[in-house]
Curated annotation (Swiss-Prot):
An intermediate of this reaction is the autophosphorylated ppk in which a phosphate is covalently linked to a histidine residue through a N-P bond. Mg(2+) binds at residues 375, 405. Keywords: ATP-binding, Kinase, Magnesium, Metal-binding, Nucleotide-binding, Phosphoprotein, Transferase. Its cofactor is Mg(2+). GO terms for molecular function: ATP binding; metal ion binding; polyphosphate kinase activity. InterPro entries: PP_kinase, PP_kinase_C_1, PP_kinase_middle, PP_kinase_middle_dom_sf, PPK_C_dom2, PPK_N_dom, PPK_N_dom_sf. GO terms for biological process: polyphosphate biosynthetic process. The keyword GTP-binding does not apply. This is Polyphosphate kinase.
């Protein structure tokens, strides 16, 4: 099982996922603005890929610490393959934008008007807007010995300008840089009396190109070309060597804007001598240069995808269901004392989770609340309820993961807010990210203390709960709540790992038990008994888990996997993974739930988890994995998982060579769209009595 040909390179697999995202932009079954959104998500994903993954590979090379993964590729070999693939896909992305999406948008009177098509009225309006709103904010920088090349912010829009002539001081540098401040909009909507009927926009870059002369009076502008630099954005706080993690992170957040260069994007009209000059300034090679036929910062077009004037070009709105029993506005503690409630977001509302916390904040019988927070978003109702609870005298403890990537700053702010309200704030465990999603409420009832809990596969983020598929379990199960109590004490205090009755948790018992359950299925198959594993995760990269799955496949276990993103396992290899089937679902909602199912000799075991099957999750994070109990709930989740395995419109099947093949209905097959089916049919949760 150590043969490198049995494994797919992690970063190459991640790129394959992003290619599947880009493919959605060509899918005419989606509304037009949603197709544009997929194209922009491709850009956003690629930005993070370069900021984190490419930066990490380059760092290994720089410090001569190249290490091959299970696939055998060294970082410099992987970078060569990645560069070739990304160049190909970025060119394709701009072709889709320019040749397909923009013409289609224009048919619906959504236009991005290029300079060559500006009317006199538009030119006049743009000149006035540039003079009043843009020029006062822009600071052009001439390049000479007293004006060295500026330190440019990560992913900022900039222009390199070729000049001719001498300025008032007799300087003749020939080059200047125009940084475009982030506060400036990248697209500007024209008034209807200027642009005409519909939604008409001009690019900020076009405005600056048109009026660059105004920024260098008396000099001739020979050329003005936009470019964008991507930098290493991974934080490098040594958690073992800092006394105050919050203070150390604040310092690193500023440094992140100016990390090492990893990619240069320039408009394709930029002359070779100028691109060479920029590459030299940033210490980049030709393979790290991306010439694009359009704006270099496509992610700033996201504002257009939610146009109120064109609801017909967007997904139809929907209202997540509220369980009928919970619609009665009954005290949630009374409900949960009798029943477990399982919710599948976004098809079912996240509101009951928020309501439980709100009721706890106001309830005089509630004594304490403990909560983990990884990503919560701006204006979080969850955080509002925790603040209210603390102000009402409850013992509120929040375990906040300050190192949640790209949410560090907002998490620092909410930590301060909770501390000011009187809550106890803990920053997790040194060396281990707290990724678990759990809430525990302690309430006095009839002279006794009783616990209530929420466990989830997704974040306490109401916005994500409308866009991501996730599960929530609301419960008063005594054993599960006792396990959570132990885990919170372990996070907040000190002590050895305590034995859990039901909960599996990383980095202690989850991986060990996961491997044991896989091996148990293999043992069943070896005895000629039925054996089946089904799982749905975001990523599968852990070599130990992959090897266990290979051995189970060899023993005869049928293994059905739904892996949205990275998958380093190769299915369909004769004699190794011929019993393993892997598919990825890409659709309206981001697939985010983690489900593990084992036939277990007929005594079915089904778990929900916050953890993907990755080394970082199973070995280096605090994660939870909790059982779904009760025949009705088990069958419900099992059927929902099986729905993903029958999808033939949003499913992409992984081939042994690492490529993906999109499924479509064949013959007399009816189209089966998992997300549409769940959206239509999932009206209320199944409740199970205890």
């Amino acid at each position: 099982m150590d043969d490198s040909s049995l494994y797919i390179h992690r970063e190459l697999s991640q790129l394959q996922f992003n290619i599947r995202v880009l493919e959605q932009a060509l899918d005419e079954s989606y509304p037009l603005l949603e197709r544009l959104k997929f194209l922009l998500i491709f850009s956003s994903n690629l930005d993070e890929f370069f900021e984190i993954r490419i930066a990490g590979l380059k760092k290994q090379i720089t410090f001569a610490r190249e290490q091959a993964g299970a696939d055998g590729l060294l970082p410099h070999q992987a970078l060569a393959r990645i560069s070739e693939l990304v160049h190909e896909q970025v060119s394709r992305q701009y072709r889709i934008l320019n040749e397909t999406l923009l013409p289609e948008l224009a048919k619906h009177q959504i236009r991005f008007i290029r300079r060559r098509h500006w009317t006199l009225k538009i030119k006049t309006w743009v000149r006035r807007f540039f003079r009043d709103e843009i020029a006062p904010i822009i600071t052009p920088i001439g390049l000479d010995p007293t004006h060295p090349f500026p330190l440019l912010v990560n992913k900022s829009l900039n222009f390199i300008v070729e000049l001719e002539g001498m300025d008032a001081f007799g300087r003749d540098s020939g080059l200047a840089i125009i940084p475009a401040p982030r506060l400036l909009p990248r697209i500007i909507r024209l008034p209807e009396d200027v642009g005409g009927e519909g939604d008409n926009y001009v690019f900020l870059s076009s405005m600056i190109h048109a009026h660059a002369d105004d920024l260098f009076p008396g000099m001739k502008v020979k050329g003005c070309y936009q470019f964008r630099l991507t930098r290493n954005a991974d934080l490098s706080v040594d958690t073992e060597d800092v006394e105050d993690l919050a203070r150390a992170l604040r310092g690193e957040l500023f440094s992140r804007r100016y990390g090492d260069a990893v990619r240069l994007e320039v408009v394709d009209t930029c002359p070779q001598n100028l691109t060479n000059y920029l590459l030299k300034q940033f210490g980049l090679s030709e393979s790290e240069l991306y010439k694009v036929s359009g704006p270099v910062n496509l992610t700033r077009l996201f504002s257009v995808t939610g146009l109120e004037s064109h609801p017909e070009l967007q997904y139809p709105p929907f209202t997540p269901a509220i369980p009928r029993l919970l619609q009665k506005k009954e005290n949630l503690f009374n409900v949960l004392s009798k029943l477990d409630v399982l919710l599948m977001h976004p098809f079912e509302s996240f509101t009951p989770v928020i309501d439980l916390l709100r009721q706890a904040a106001k309830d005089p019988n509630v004594l304490a609340i403990k909560q983990t927070l990884y990503r919560s978003g701006a204006n979080s109702e969850i955080v509002d309820a925790l603040v209210e609870a603390a102000r009402n005298g409850k013992e509120v403890t929040a375990v906040i993961e300050l190192r949640a990537r790209f949410d560090e700053e907002s998490n620092l702010q909410l930590a301060s807010r909770l501390q000011q309200a009187g809550a106890v704030v803990i920053y997790g465990v040194v060396g281990f990210k707290t990724h678990a999603k759990m809430m525990l409420i302690l309430r006095r009832e009839d002279g006794e203390l009783r616990r209530y809990a929420h466990l989830g596969t997704g974040n306490y983020h109401a916005g994500n709960a409308r866009l991501y598929t996730d599960y929530s379990l609301l419960t008063a199960d005594v054993a599960l709540c006792e396990d959570l109590h132990k885990l919170f004490n372990q996070l907040i205090g000190m002590g050895k790992t305590l034995r859990m009755k039901k909960l599996l948790h990383a980095p202690f018992t989850l991986k060990k038990n996961l491997l044991e359950m896989i091996n148990r299925e293999a043992a069943q198959a070896a005895l000629g008994q039925p054996a089946h594993i089904m799982a749905k995760v975001n990523s599968l990269t852990d070599p130990k888990v992959i090897r266990a799955l290979y051995k189970a496949s060899q023993a005869g276990v049928r293994i059905d996997l739904v892996v949205r993103g990275m998958c380093c396992l190769r299915p369909g290899i004769p004699g190794v993974s011929h019993n393993i089937h892997v598919r990825s679902i890409i659709g309206r909602f981001l697939e985010h739930s983690r489900i593990y199912y084992f036939l277990n000799g007929g005594d079915e075991k089904l778990y929900l988890s916050s953890a993907d099957w990755m080394e970082r999750n199973l070995d280096m994070r605090v994660e939870t994995c909790f059982p779904v109990e009760g025949k009705k709930l088990v069958q419900r989740v099992k059927k929902e998982l099986e729905t993903y395995l029958t999808d033939n419109t949003q499913a992409w099947v992984l081939q042994a060579d690492g490529s993906y093949q999109r499924l479509s209905p064949t013959g007399n097959q009816n189209p089966r769209n998992t997300q549409a089916t769940l959206l239509e049919k999932l009206a209320a949760p199944v409740l199970t009595a205890r």
